[in-house]
């Protein structure tokens, strides 16, 4: 004798509802307080761009530290390593700058985009100045590179103070 197990419709509805709610909870982005965001297309575009800005900021901050290391005397006379690290920092800064420039910004994010481009540009100038100093280590070139790095720090602090950057 084979007895069929009958599952009522309300059980199927509850299980389906639990699965849909679980998926929604799992894939929904969270705001800074950990609450799920209700995403309309506009809100999603703003949130996506904000996350891009935070990622660019983190990468530029890392590159800033690497440029500062190139300007320090931590290499013990190893010109090849110092030059190589400076060149890598320059190339990666250029990649971030291109990524910022090529990412479409929603109208509300245009000022934040300009801030990010400014930070990337000043970081690129600092990387170039560091490489000039590595190639010709004169006090004037070191001073110029330090000034460029200070300018990058200043623009970075302006980006950090903006409402778009939640890393603060």
Annotate each language-model stretch with its function.
Residues 1-11:
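Short, low-complexity patches enriched in S/T/P/G
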Residues 24-31, 130, 134:
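Structural signature of transmembrane alpha-helix termini at the membrane-water interface
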Residues 41-168:
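Alpha-helical segments in soluble extracytoplasmic regions
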Residues 27-48:
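Ser/Thr/Pro/Gly-rich low-complexity linker/stalk segments immediately outside membranes or between
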Residues 1, 16-19, 94-99:
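Mid-chain, structured segments of secreted extracytoplasmic proteins
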């Amino acid at each position: 004798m084979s007895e069929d197990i009958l599952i009522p419709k309300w059980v199927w509805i509850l299980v389906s509802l639990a699965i849909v709610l679980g998926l929604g909870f799992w894939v929904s982005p969270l705001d800074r307080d950990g609450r799920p965001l209700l995403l309309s297309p506009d809100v999603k575009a703003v949130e996506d761009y904000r996350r891009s800005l935070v990622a660019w900021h983190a990468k530029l901050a890392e590159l800033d530290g690497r440029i500062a290391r190139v300007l320090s005397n931590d290499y013990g006379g190893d010109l090849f390593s110092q030059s190589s690290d400076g060149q890598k920092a320059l190339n990666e800064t250029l990649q971030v700058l291109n990524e910022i420039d090529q990412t479409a910004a929603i109208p509300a994010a245009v000022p934040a985009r300009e801030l990010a481009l400014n930070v990337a540009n000043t970081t690129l100038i600092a990387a170039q100045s560091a490489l000039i100093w590595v190639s010709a280590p004169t006090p004037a070139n070191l001073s110029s590179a330090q000034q460029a790095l200070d300018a990058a720090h200043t623009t970075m602090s302006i980006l950090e103070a903006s409402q778009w950057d939640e890393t603060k």
